[in-house]
Every structure is written in structure tokens, then in C-alpha cells.
Amino acid sequence: MSGPNGDPNISVDDGIIEDEDEFSEEEYAAIDSMLDQINSCLDDIEDRNDALNGKLHELLESNRQARKDFRQQLNDEEASPPPAEDPASRDTQTED
């Protein structure tokens, strides 16, 4: 018969699993301290990731707004005809 994951039932009595590892209180305390340090580092990484994610969203929104403004400016320039030339300015430009 198999276990919940499809693994065969294995008992300690079968001699396959040997649970002779016994840890002292100091070893448990050291492991606990290391896990706390790892957890603290992971929290710091998560905070930095959240900050970067926020900055990227701000940059993306700024980029979208700049593109929208640029497109609007191009559309405005295409919609309005170029200014009429002043005959006096044309005469001064052709003189050499």
C-alpha cells in the first residue's frame, strides 16, 4: 500500500530510516538564529523589491504621459497650418 503521495509506506522498523541525529540545545539555538537572519534578509529583499516595483510603475506612468503629450503635440502641429510667410521676411532671406 502507498502513502498519500504514492510513496510506499516505510517505517523506522524497516531499517531504511535511521533517526539517530540528535541536536543539542546550542545547535537548535544556532539554527534558529540562522533562520532569523535569513528571514530578516528576505524581508529586506522584499522591501527593496517593493520599492523598485513602485519606482518602475512611476517611471512607466511618466513615460506613458510623455508619449501621450508628444503624440498630442504632433497632432496639433499636423492640424494647424504652418504660419503664412511675411513678404518682408522673404525679401530679407533671399538677399545675399
From Swiss-Prot:
Coiled-coil stretches: 39-79
GO annotation, cellular component aspect: anchoring junction; cell junction; cytoplasm; cytoskeleton; subapical part of cell
Location of the protein in the cell: Cell junction; Cytoplasm, Cytoskeleton
GO MF annotations, alphabetized: molecular adaptor activity
Biased composition (Basic and acidic residues): 87-96
Residue ranges of the region described as Disordered: 63-96
Record has Metal-binding as a keyword: no
GO process annotations (BP): intermediate filament bundle assembly
Assigned keywords, A-Z: Cell junction, Coiled coil, Cytoplasm, Cytoskeleton
Keyword Acetylation: no
Highest taxon listed in the record's lineage: Eukaryota
Family: Belongs to the UPF0184 (EST00098) family.
Role of this protein: Essential for intermediate filament organization in intestinal cells, interacts with intermediate filament and regulates intestinal lumen morphology.
Protein name: Bublin coiled-coil protein
Encoding gene per record: bbln
